[in-house]
């Protein structure tokens, strides 16, 4: 269990606001700009754990004046990276062989980690250039 909840738990807007300290307007803005989506069930919008953590991170950025509109660049970048990684592993991910699919999912997680590290290094390099 993570944070007292079962894996795969869903969170209401109130849960997300309470657990992240985010302004409810910020969460609505993130939905409006497609940064998070949530899922409507019975007239109530629920968010996954990852979306809750996105709200937490954006809440930190909001303290520096970064809002939903500014986050399009991050969302677009993540979408492009996901498409690239999916295209690399698409045949294995579609395989009917459960072992091959499992290996592809593990490779996908590894590639995500490596690309995240690469992005971090490129950002640090560019920020150092700005600072000098």
Identify the meaning behind each predicted range.
Residues 1-132:
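Arg/Lys-rich, alpha-helical DNA-contact motif
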């Amino acid at each position: 269990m993570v944070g007292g909840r079962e894996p795969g738990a869903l969170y209401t807007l109130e849960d997300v606001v309470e657990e992240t300290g985010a302004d409810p307007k910020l969460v609505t803005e993130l939905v409006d700009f497609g940064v998070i989506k949530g899922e409507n069930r019975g007239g109530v919008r629920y968010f996954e754990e990852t979306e809750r953590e996105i709200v937490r991170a954006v809440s930190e950025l909001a303290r520096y004046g970064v809002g939903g509109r500014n986050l399009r660049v991050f969302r677009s970048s993540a979408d492009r990276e996901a498409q690239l990684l999916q295209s690399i592993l698409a045949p294995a991910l579609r395989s009917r062989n459960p072992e091959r699919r499992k290996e592809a999912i593990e490779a996908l997680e590894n590639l995500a980690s490596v690309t995240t590290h690469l992005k971090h290094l490129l950002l640090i390099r560019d920020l150092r250039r700005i600072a000098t």
